[in-house]
């Protein structure tokens, strides 16, 4: 199934749930989050390689991402249509729920040599914002480490080719990276599969 068709059958139902809840009272974050499980997995733990895990995400990052989808400010194949059916209050309820869930890195194969190169690239160019090797979801940046390789490839393509919103410094860095640099970073993030690495003291 392609990215364009992935989850398309869920869109009508998801929009109905969001709009119906908003018309009365805000449903619990857990109930709203349940509607995301078809693509993002139970409690935000993705089992589909084209879809990111969203458990443990920063609340502010989650809300802003959903607003960007809803307002057409972020490239999407499906999420813009899904986000349209929810209010900001519902985004905030979902964000609180997902932020409280433990992050489980994807178990997958990776190229160890590329991962070693990627670790050096990350430390030099990406670590100031994506701290702790990309395992730390605070500071309102995305969780990179432990995501599926196909999802990371799509995400980098969105940033580089489709103008996905990003900090100016990140935009400059990505413009300088070769395809090999990007692949090295992706395999570095994919290599981090120890769940203990994602537990950080606040």
Description of each model-found segment:
Residues 19-23:
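Sec/Tat signal peptide C-region and signal peptidase I cleavage site
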Residues 84-106, 150, 173-201:
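C-terminal capping alpha-helices of c-type cytochrome domains
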Residues 1-9:
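Bacterial N-terminal signal peptides that target proteins for export
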Residues 8-17:
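Bacterial N-terminal signal peptides
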Residues 31-42, 64-67, 92-96, 120-132, ...:
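C-type cytochrome heme c attachment motif
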Residues 45-46, 75, 100-113, 127-128, ...:
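Inter-heme linker and motif-flanking segments adjacent to c-type heme-binding CXXCH motifs
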